[in-house]
């Protein structure tokens, strides 16, 4: 069991399908560890859905805020209070043609450096066979298997300083480490060799880490 039983920690998850959070919630429920999943704040304004998200104690992410600290404030507070927080650092469903994690944003690194929370990879594979990326249709055919791999904490202690996420070089290095480990863990779960480079959603091609 690689999930801590005490203290706040951050799960970094790859994003294949809109039902990924269901898989995450199921695994964490079986582990008897409550999890706060980060979700874009716009969804909280949707009738019925917003109420359900608040009931589930999801954490709103205000992506329009100009201050990066304000965007992640609720998640940082939850981590400081000893809670488990889950983030999809790609920011959206992967656009990689082969469903590898695409270039991640800096949010996970910022949270880790600002709170000192452990960062643990939560990798899954198979949800895309139940609900394809960008689709709202569920495939109810049997034998749709979802596999989960929980990795070791990503070493970031040497980057944690009093300046936290204000240290831009530390944020960049932490982001690269998280990116690299996520891809390595996906490769291990899929039993495949990872591609060279990472998919950049803007350039629509693979680039160096």
Where are these regions (language model features)?
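Catalytic core of membrane glycerolipid acyltransferases/transacylases, capturing the structured
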Residues: 5-65
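A charged, well-structured terminal subsegment
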Residues: 73-81, 146-172, 178
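Hydrophobic/aromatic ligand-binding patch that stacks against planar heteroaromatic rings
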Residues: 27, 52, 77, 110-114
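Residue-level preference for the first positions of well-ordered beta-strands
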Residues: 8-10, 84-88, 120
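Catalytic-site beta-strand/loop segments enriched in glycine and acidic/polar residues
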Residues: 78-108
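Short, highly charged C-terminal tails/helix-capping segments
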Residues: 189-209
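A cross-family acyltransferase "interaction/gating" segment
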Residues: 3, 98-165
């Amino acid at each position: 069991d690689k999930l801590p039983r005490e203290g706040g920690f951050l799960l970094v998850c790859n994003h294949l399908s809109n039902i990924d959070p269901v898989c995450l919630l199921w695994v964490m429920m079986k582990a008897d560890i409550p999890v706060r999943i980060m979700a874009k704040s716009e969804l909280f304004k949707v009738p019925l859905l917003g109420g359900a998200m608040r009931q589930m104690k999801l954490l709103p992410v205000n992506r329009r805020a100009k201050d990066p600290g304000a965007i992640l404030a609720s998640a940082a507070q939850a981590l400081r209070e000893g809670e488990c927080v889950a983030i999809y650092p790609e920011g959206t469903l992967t656009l990689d043609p082969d469903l590898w994690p695409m270039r991640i944003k800096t949010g996970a690194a910022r949270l880790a450096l600002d709170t000192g929370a452990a960062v643990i990879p939560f990798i899954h594979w198979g949800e895309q066979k139940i609900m394809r990326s960008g689709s709202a249709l569920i495939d109810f055919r049997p034998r749709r298997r979802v596999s989960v791999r929980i990795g070791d904490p990503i070493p970031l202690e040497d980057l944690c300083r009093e300046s936290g996420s204000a240290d831009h070089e530390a944020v960049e290095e932490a982001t690269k480490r998280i990116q690299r480990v996520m891809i390595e863990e996906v490769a291990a779960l899929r039993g495949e060799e990872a591609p060279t480079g990472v998919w950049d959603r803007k350039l629509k091609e693979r680039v160096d880490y």
